[in-house]
């Protein structure tokens, strides 16, 4: 055992809301689908030296289970069905689905197994990696420093928004996966609760314990998996959008637009989808350009943009959120999800730019071709070419 062997995680609900939302949809629609996912560090950090400590934490995760009070709380939410929650009660993480190794200094992690199970690994595992690395690298950093940084930011925020009508400004905590620690995230969220514009968190455990609204719908993996689930690649994005509405016909209706670029998404997002979904989420590319495209698309379809919500969640901080609010607030409803810049903002601490992304579904490749080339992920060049052709995409620069 290492000196840092105490478990990082204490609750199965210490994860992002959209993981449970997607897991229920997978449970009902794609019970037998198998997937594989891989870890990526987008920065230059050599994290392989932490492999043993991370492997210990993975083993510890098998002891997490849904507690009775957590089950009761989930049961009271409007979108979970009894069959899924009863299954979730019996769910346990299976460490055999995870391989962790030190590949010449690089951290190598691969997940594989039934999608209904593998889907829950990503967020808590990233939170574990982030917290373990920061325990080693920054043992002197603490919660008080994180809170001081936030207080200074809130002073600047007040000055920045003086005289601005903030009644349509809505901020959410999206900071679980790259947080400095569980304790820092909870402290930051508790402080933000004092602000009228703070509306919720993506973390189900915090939402339950702090009586907050849990926030989240679906992630890239929902669209990626449909690239192999759908018999027609060109129709896969529409199939993903339709399947989501089958599971959630009138709630959790914010659609993620950049699995295969915003332009390709809008070509698939016709009047029925645009009417039924409550809005769209931005996660790559220029946010102003994206928002203008979204508003123009709604107007072209004869839909009032004021009846829809745009959610911005790509590398945001408070200043960027205010800039976007100034630009768009008179034309559309807005929400802003901030992650790392809230939950890992401590002097002399370098946040990790880490992800875990789907790479296979039923043994075949899947891809993410976002509006930021550096966020593109796929091993199989032939499949990327097929995807570009199916969605009539221009050439996309090579990315990590």
Curated annotation (Swiss-Prot):
Q: Which UniProt keywords apply?
A: Ligase, Phosphoprotein, Pyridine nucleotide biosynthesis
Coiled-coil stretches: none
The family database entries (InterPro entries) matched by this protein are listed as: N/Namide_PRibTrfase, NAPRTase_N, Nic_PRibTrfase, Nic_PRibTrfase-Fam, Nicotinate_pribotase-like_C
| Pathway the protein contributes to | Cofactor biosynthesis; NAD(+) biosynthesis; nicotinate D-ribonucleotide from nicotinate: step 1/1
| Gene3D superfamilies assigned | nicotinate phosphoribosyltransferase
Tell me how the protein is altered or processed after translation.
Transiently phosphorylated on a His residue during the reaction cycle. Phosphorylation strongly increases the affinity for substrates and increases the rate of nicotinate D-ribonucleotide production. Dephosphorylation regenerates the low-affinity form of the enzyme, leading to product release.
Write down the CDD domains for this protein, in alphabetical order.
Answer: PncB_like (cd01401)
Taxonomically, the superkingdom here is Bacteria
Enumerate the Gene Ontology biological process terms: NAD biosynthetic process via the salvage pathway
Residues recorded with modification Phosphohistidine: 220
EC number(s) on record? 6.3.4.21
Instruction: Report which reactions are catalysed by this protein.
Output: nicotinate + 5-phospho-alpha-D-ribose 1-diphosphate + ATP + H2O = nicotinate beta-D-ribonucleotide + ADP + phosphate + diphosphate
A single GO CC term for this protein reads: cytosol
| One of the record's GO molecular function terms | nicotinate phosphoribosyltransferase activity
Question: What is the stated purpose of this protein?
Answer: Catalyzes the synthesis of beta-nicotinate D-ribonucleotide from nicotinate and 5-phospho-D-ribose 1-phosphate at the expense of ATP.
Show the PANTHER family listed in the entry.
NICOTINATE PHOSPHORIBOSYLTRANSFERASE
* Entry's family note: Belongs to the NAPRTase family.
The entry's protein name is Nicotinate phosphoribosyltransferase
Q: Which gene encodes it?
A: pncB
